[in-house]
Amino acid sequence: MSAKLYDETNPISIENYAQKLIGKTFNDVLNDYTKYESELLISEEKEEYAENHENKKRKGGLGDLIEECYFHYKCNNDSRPDFPDAGVELKVTPYKINKNKTLSAKERLIITMIDYFKVVEENFEDSHLWNKSQLILLIYYLYSKDIKNRL
């Protein structure tokens, strides 16, 4: 795998790299990834990978695609931020245009899972929720029911 194009310890570097996503589709990201990282995905895997991440019933699939194909790290269920050395949590979420032309979130945004049995014993400032939510890189994309393929 080639060297990362951003400094994973620096929030500004991560944000600047993320800015390069503006104007790209998820398919663009996948194609760029497979073009330069061909040793990781062979063509048959690319089709299966794309189909799996395009699945509308799979919540988080497009976020996983951004994590793996753009930022080049494997998705995980770690309670730490996605970029632990920079303290940055990455979230990819859809927005929609309402009938009255206003914008709204298409779905709720989940930062982390909370253990309701343990949370009462935690100090908020020491919690993994606080650790994850201090610095969030929010990448949003337009959802439209008219678009059949999310990629």
Model-derived regions: residue spans:
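Nucleic-acid endonuclease domains
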Residues: M1-P84, E89-L151
